[in-house]
Amino acid sequence: MIQKETNLVVADNSGAKKVRCIHVFGGTGRRYASLGDQVIVSVKAAVPGGVVKKKEVCKAVVVRCVKEQRRKDGSYIRFDENAVVLLNAQGEPRGTRIFGPVARELRDRRYMKIVSLAPEVL
């Protein structure tokens, strides 16, 4: 469960390392985001010379979440960290590589580019 002020790890090579959620998409009453949901983030730590800079505001999609999520078959999926992939205005990843596994829920949400770049889909 990702909400405002949640600190997140960036799982791509866009140049950002740590970000903080500042908005969850889905209406004014929506509080939490989970796997495959879009959020707006502020970059808190970045690599020098990277594509994104510190203090930059951008869109991101949640690819790993600590809070377990139930699947249709009754199983649960959860990860060790909250991670996002930064997106551009067209909804495509800003980086060219994805680090770590991503959830299968991204395929259902039509993030095919992220799924194809990921080393493992759980």
Swiss-Prot record:
Sample GO molecular function, one term: structural constituent of ribosome
Keywords annotated in UniProt: Ribonucleoprotein, Ribosomal protein, RNA-binding, rRNA-binding
Domain of life according to the entry: Bacteria
One Gene Ontology term from the biological process aspect of the record: translation
CDD domains, per database record: Ribosomal_uL14
Name of one Pfam family that matches: Ribosomal_L14
GO cellular component: cytosolic large ribosomal subunit
Protein family (similarity comment): Belongs to the universal ribosomal protein uL14 family.
Function: Binds to 23S rRNA. Forms part of two intersubunit bridges in the 70S ribosome.
HAMAP family: Ribosomal_uL14 (MF_01367)
Subunit structure: Part of the 50S ribosomal subunit. Forms a cluster with proteins L3 and L19. In the 70S ribosome, L14 and L19 interact and together make contacts with the 16S rRNA in bridges B5 and B8.
Protein's UniProt name: Large ribosomal subunit protein uL14
Protein source organism: Chlorobium luteolum (strain DSM 273 / BCRC 81028 / 2530)
